[in-house]
Amino acid sequence: MSVKPARAKALSVEDRQSMILDAVTPLLIEHGQTVTTRQIAQCAGIAEGTIFRAFDSKDNLLRAAMDRQLDPEPFRLELAALDRELPLEERVRAMVSLLRRRFAQVFALMTAVGSMGRPHTHDVAHELTVLLADVLAPDLLRLTVGPERSGQVIRMIALAASVPHITAGPDFDDDELTALILYGIIGFPTPPNAPC
């Protein structure tokens, strides 16, 4: 006599949607919009019909996945949580690392799926720059440009380092980018009357 396995605990619609969204993101990066509901169901460990009970359609699921991945709020919270007591170099390295991970994730999804989902706005970019400036604020007197301008530079360099066709050649690591941001490519300028 065989024993029937116990039925899985019932999840709320939101929990089920979250579980499916967790499963679909890597599949979207790998297969783009051609990912099948069968692949999604297998990856999530659910029946195909469960997808349609949670999202009504594959298009709704893909849109929800893109919206979730492009939502800037979780990323903002990560940046806001950076310890202001860390030395400046460690804070900049942490910002570079978080930004590169975020940009790489967004680029991978956009490459695989296209421009589906919420558009990037200048308001979001400005909010991000202000947040980066806030993380830099404890070292305001050490900065050679204002904190918002410094935030723009960090974001710009992290963005450029995250675009595969811009970074032809060996990849930069976070330490190299941090040094470039903080010290440039020639270091500190020599004062005009300094002995050689």
Regions found by a protein language model. Give the residues of each.
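Amphipathic alpha-helical packing segments from all-alpha helical-bundle domains
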Residues: 90, 101-111, 117-152, 163, ...
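Hydrophobic alpha-helical connector segments
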Residues: 77-105, 154
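N-terminal intrinsically disordered/low-complexity leader segments
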Residues: 1-15, 74, 143, 190-196
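Amphipathic, non-transmembrane alpha-helical scaffold segments
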Residues: 13, 17, 66, 121-129
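Short, flexible, glycine-rich and Lys/Arg-enriched loop motifs at helix boundaries
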Residues: 29-35, 67-88
